[in-house]
A protein has these predicted regions:
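Active-site-proximal substrate-binding groove within the catalytic cores of carbohydrate-active enzymes
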Residues: 1-142
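Non-catalytic C-terminal accessory domains or segments of carbohydrate-active enzymes
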Residues: 61, 74-80, 88-90, 107-236
């Protein structure tokens, strides 16, 4: 193993606890995998396994949408896999069981990039074997929301315990409860309505050390190092 592969493994572990549910009508008339003669090239074989031609937008097994709910958070993780070389596409949000009239922030996990998205989701082209993971978080009625991290490909159902906003005597307080291990370094990306106005003084950390704060128009990136297994980030 090299360092790059080890880092990739860290970002996909541990596996998540999942529960089965209704996924709608499924066509079972075509097998998921077929026998591919060894005489075929790798590229010919991948097209055959996907049961699709080169012009198909959604070959079998290439597009996955997982709706997640945990600790006061709701978000959708979309994974697109290069089972064959894929062109860039625009996916209507209703095809992902999301309300297209709402406002979302998209976050590309592998590129660690965020952008606003409404109506459709833009996905880039993929070479054979490549993968894109994008999180969609509804920000319509929020002034602060976690939209991604670099800890786990689920963005982030592993190190984030809960998220909430409450009204207190100090005003509105945003609270992010976290878990990890000592010396774990994580960058959390948040949508903040007026991120450019945020100062270090209004961010409070317990059990973690804040090592970097980067503010953009409506994006705040906090890089932290865990000092304890359980930690809290608060922002007034």
């Amino acid at each position: 193993y090299d360092l790059e592969r080890i880092e990739l493994m860290k970002k996909t572990m541990p596996p998540l606890e999942v529960h089965s549910g209704e996924i709608g009508p499924v066509d079972y008339s075509t097998p998921a995998c077929t026998y591919i003669p060894k005489t075929k090239s790798e590229k010919e074989a991948c097209y055959s396994i996907a049961h699709e031609g080169k012009d198909e937008l959604y070959p079998m097994g290439s597009l996955w949408s997982i709706h997640m709910e945990q600790g006061g958070r709701n978000w959708c993780v979309i994974q697109r896999c290069g089972v064959i070389p894929l062109s860039k596409i625009d996916v209507p949000l209703e095809n992902l069981s999301l309300d297209p009239s709402r406002n979302y922030y998209a976050f590309d996990f592998w590129k660690q990039q965020a952008w606003k998205q409404t109506g459709i989701l833009n996905l880039h082209e993929l070479e054979l074997g490549d993968c894109q993971v994008v999180t969609l978080t509804d920000i319509t009625d929020k002034y602060v929301a976690l939209i991604g991290s670099n800890r786990h490909v689920s963005c982030d159902a592993v190190s984030v315990v809960s998220e909430c906003t409450t009204d207190t005597q100090r005003g509105r307080v945003y609270r992010l409860a976290l878990k990890g291990f000592e010396e774990l370094c994580v960058t959390y990306t948040l949508y903040v309505e007026k991120a450019a106005e945020i100062t270090r003084e209004v961010i409070h950390a317990h059990g973690i050390q804040i090592v970097s704060v980067q503010a953009y128009t409506d994006i705040l990136q906090l890089t932290v190092v865990f000092e304890k297994k359980e930690a809290v980030l608060e922002m007034n």
